[in-house]
Regions:
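Dynamic helix-loop-helix/coil hinge segments at AAA+ ATPase domain boundaries and subdomain interfaces
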Residues: 16-37
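Loop/turn-to-beta-strand initiation segments
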Residues: 83-84, 115-118, 146-152
Length: 191
């Protein structure tokens, strides 16, 4: 009983410290709302093999179609299995990294985000970012490459990522590292 209680507290702590915007699970997602989604593929993420294989998951689709909900559901499942997990909006991530750089703590902050087994970066490309921010994101993605899993949500197709970062070469470098060993969930449409 005591071991079970300790385990429950540890799981609760993992979920609480992950910073999820809400606590929604796979059971809360209405797959009939998104008939183009491969439900089997999405539910297969519950087994968390993608973490063991250091694979990424990228959700691409219009605003309001459930990308954040699904990314959060996967993250909650990972945290419940005691994998270090963190959720952050892309603009907040870049702002935190820039603040750390101005305080001469950039490497520490970069390492902080790089160490999570699962890092969820929400809304990549919702707002464009300057070259400094794009370089910081590249450094983070590069540091995590083939070491940990990253989950991305974006409303921009990959062919338009150069618009986000204002640099074709940098966009290609980020995409190269993200897309290698990735599960890409496309065609999330707003009905």
């Amino acid at each position: 009983m005591e071991i079970e209680l300790r385990n429950e507290k540890a799981i609760y702590g993992c979920v609480r410290t992950a910073g999820f915007p809400f606590l929604k699970t796979f059971d809360d997602f209405d797959f009939s709302f998104q008939p183009t989604l491969n439900k089997e593929q999405i539910l297969d993420f519950k087994n968390l093999r993608f973490i063991e294989n250091n694979e990424n998951i990228i959700f691409v689709g219009s605003p309001g179609v459930g990308k954040t909900h699904l990314a959060t559901s996967i993250g909650i499942k990972a945290a419940q299995n005691r994998n270090s997990t963190y959720f952050i909006n892309c603009n907040d991530l870049i702002a935190n990294l820039k603040k750390a750089q101005s305080e001469n703590r950039f490497i520490n902050r970069l390492n902080h985000y790089a160490r999570y087994k699962v890092l969820i970066i929400d809304e990549v490309g919702f707002l464009p970012m300057d070259l400094d921010g794009a370089n910081m994101l590249f450094q983070l993605i590069n540091k995590r490459y083939e070491k940990h899993s990253t989950i991305i949500t974006t409303n921009k197709p990959f062919g338009k990522w150069h618009e986000i970062f204002n640099d074709v070469t940098l966009a290609n470098a980020i995409l190269d590292r993200l897309l290698h060993h990735s599960h890409i969930i496309l065609s999330l449409i707003h009905i």
